[in-house]
C-alpha cells in the first residue's frame, strides 16, 4: 500500500465551506462583498488572449511596481499565491520536523495546517477573556526553542489588535525566532509593522489582495521582509508562484487603490453601525479592527446561521471551536448589506432572546465596546 508521510497522515483536513456560495450575500469569508474595481475587470478581459495564456508569467516588472506600492525594495518582496501560499513558503524554508510553532488561539487555522504538513509540532497560548493576547505567557513560552510565531494582526476570527509595544517586546525577546505578522486586514485597521522589516531580521509581514482589493479568486499575495530572508524564501519556492492574470489584476488594483480605500472606509463605518446596533440589542460582541465582527448569539447560533442561509445570507459559524461555541462571525459589507443583516437578525429575536439560552451565557464573559454582557 502506498502511504503518505506521517505528518500528512496525522493531519485534520482543513476544509472551509466553500461550495454553494454563488448568488448569496457572502458575509462568511471576509471577502470584499461588492467586488473589485471595474478597471480590474476590464484589464482582465483585455488580457485574455491565446498568446498571453500560452506564455509563462514574467515577474520582475510586477515585483518592482508592487514593491513601490508597499514602500519596500524589490528584493524585499516575494510574490505568493495568496496568504495561504505565503505560509506554505515560509514553512518550506524554515520548518524542520519537530520544530515548534507558537500560535494564539483562536486564530487562522492555516498556520497550523502548513506547519504540521512540514512535520512541525504546536505550542498554543490562549487569548484571555477580553480576547487580548497574554504577552507574559508568550514570553515564557518563547524561552523554549520556538522556531516561529504566527500572529494575525488584526486577528481572525476576533478582529483584535496586538499593540506595537507588545509586538516589539516579543520580537526583541526572541531574536532567533521567526515572527510572521499576517496583515491581511491592514486596510481596515491601518496598523502595520511593515516599516520594521529592516530593523528586525526575524520579522516577516504578509499582505493579500483577497480582502479589501476584492481579488480572492485570483490568489495574489506577497511576503515582505529583509532581503536576506526574502532570498531564502525564494530558494524553496515554486519558480512560477503567481499566474499572469493575477499579476494583471493586482497591478491594476494598486493603480486604482482609491477604490479599495473607499470600500474600506465604508466597511469601517458600517462596522461601527453594526456594533452600536448590537449594543442596543444587548448582544455580546468582540470589538474589531477588521472587516468582520465576532458575535455571541448563544446556543442557538447554528440555527441562526442556518436560518440566515435559507434567506440567502451566509455567515461563519464558529461552533466547531470549543472556545467559541455560540459565536457567529459576520463579515461587514456595504451599507445596504449591513442594514439587511440587522433587519434579518431583528426577525430572529425568538432565537437570540431565548431565556434558557441566556442562562447558558453566564458561562461566558464577552467584551463589547462599552462593557461586559453576561
Describe the function of each predicted region.
Residues 73-77, 97-100, 183, 201-202, ...:
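Short acidic capping loops at alpha-helix termini that bridge into adjacent secondary structure
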Residues 2-82, 89:
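N-terminal small-domain helix-loop-helix segment of the aminotransferase-like
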Residues 268, 279-311, 367, 372-373:
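Conserved PLP-binding catalytic core of the aspartate aminotransferase-like
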Residues 307-311, 316, 320-374:
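PLP-dependent enzyme catalytic core of the Aspartate aminotransferase-like
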Residues 8, 93-151:
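PLP-dependent aminotransferase-like
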Residues 129-187:
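Active-site phosphate-binding strand-loop segment of PLP-dependent enzymes
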Residues 202-286:
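PLP-dependent aminotransferase class I/II
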Amino acid at each position: 500500500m502506498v502511504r503518505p508521510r506521517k505528518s500528512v497522515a496525522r493531519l485534520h483536513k482543513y476544509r472551509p465551506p466553500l461550495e454553494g456560495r454563488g448568488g448569496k450575500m457572502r458575509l462568511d469569508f471576509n471577502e470584499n462583498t461588492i467586488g473589485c474595481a471595474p478597471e480590474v475587470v476590464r484589464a482582465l478581459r483585455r488580457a485574455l488572449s491565446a498568446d498571453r495564456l500560452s506564455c509563462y508569467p514574467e515577474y520582475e516588472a510586477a515585483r518592482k511596481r508592487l514593491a513601490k506600492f508597499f514602500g519596500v525594495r524589490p528584493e524585499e518582496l516575494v510574490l505568493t499565491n495568496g496568504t495561504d501560499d505565503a505560509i506554505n513558503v515560509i514553512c518550506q524554508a524554515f520548518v524542520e520536523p519537530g520544530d515548534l510553532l507558537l500560535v494564539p488561539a483562536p486564530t487562522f487555522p492555516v498556520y497550523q495546517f502548513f506547519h504540521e504538513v512540514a512535520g512541525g509540532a504546536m505550542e498554543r497560548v490562549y487569548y484571555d477573556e477580553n480576547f487580548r493576547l497574554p504577552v507574559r505567557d508568550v514570553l515564557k513560552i518563547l524561552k523554549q526553542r520556538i522556531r516561529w510565531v504566527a500572529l494575525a494582526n488584526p486577528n481572525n476570527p476576533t478582529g483584535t489588535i496586538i499593540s506595537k509595544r507588545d509586538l516589539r517586546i516579543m520580537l526583541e525577546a526572541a531574536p532567533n525566532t521567526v515572527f510572521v505578522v499576517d496583515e491581511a486586514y491592514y486596510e481596515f485597521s491601518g496598523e502595520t509593522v511593515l516599516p520594521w522589516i529592516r530593523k528586525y531580521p526575524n520579522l516577516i509581514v504578509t499582505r493579500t489582495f483577497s480582502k479589501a482589493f476584492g481579488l480572492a479568486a485570483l490568489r495574489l499575495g506577497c511576503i515582505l521582509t529583509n532581503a536576506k530572508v526574502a532570498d531564502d524564501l525564494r530558494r524553496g519556492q515554486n519558480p512560477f508562484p503567481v499566474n499572469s492574470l493575477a499579476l494583471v489584476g493586482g497591478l491594476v488594483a494598486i493603480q486604482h487603490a482609491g477604490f479599495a480605500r473607499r470600500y474600506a472606509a465604508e466597511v469601517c463605518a458600517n462596522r461601527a453601525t453594526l456594533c452600536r446596533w448590537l449594543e442596543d440589542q444587548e448582544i455580546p460582541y468582540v470589538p474589531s479592527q477588521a472587516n468582520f465582527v465576532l458575535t455571541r448569539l448563544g446556543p442557538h447560533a447554528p440555527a441562526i446561521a442556518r436560518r440566515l442561509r435559507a434567506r440567502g445570507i451566509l455567515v461563519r459559524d464558529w461552533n466547531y471551536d470549543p472556545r467559541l461555541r455560540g459565536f457567529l462571525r459576520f463579515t461587514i459589507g456595504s451599507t445596504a448589506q449591513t442594514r439587511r443583516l440587522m433587519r434579518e437578525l431583528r426577525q430572529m429575536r425568538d432565537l437570540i432572546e431565548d431565556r434558557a439560552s441566556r442562562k447558558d451565557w453566564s458561562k461566558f464573559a464577552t467584551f463589547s465596546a462599552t462593557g461586559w454582557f453576561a
